[in-house]
Amino acid sequence: MNIFVTDPSPTVSAQVLPDKHIVKMPLESCQMLAIVCSEKWGHGYGEIHKKDGEPYKTDKGAFRGHPCTVWANESNINAWWLVAHAMALCEEYTHRYGKVHSCENTVLEAGHLIPFTLERPKSFAFAGPDEFKYDTSIDTFTAYKRYISSKPWVAFNYLRDPSRPVSYTHLTLPTRIR
């Protein structure tokens, strides 16, 4: 569970992610949005539904305490950024794989339920290793870029669209991480 916020723009943030994240992050976004929309744990906007028509189960509130879910649930501003990012992830999935992601309609449904705002988030949550989380010399965007680039598979995980790898996949990591 995470929102890999590599840029203030939800679209740019999605476009630079490796294939692995493009495939799995729309589902994680939908799980967070289901909590945001739920009556019990969120704002009571209504249920959002999976591709098969079944509503996401939110009665136990799974993931409600995750830093990214807490962040998304703090305001409509944050929730709308997540909707825009999830939609951008789905569009990127279509761009790379030539088909529609199974979560796309769920993201659209959440977008219809959550009250719209044009405002942008003032801050973002970081859910990652301590060596990035507590580095006060970097912002959240850089922390996520370093976290992603620390994975040995990342540089080779842009097979669907080789034009998408970005310069941060070649960052020199601090010695304590290497």
Report the location of each language-model feature.
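Single conserved hydrophobic/aromatic residue that forms the stacking wall/gate
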Residues: 170-178
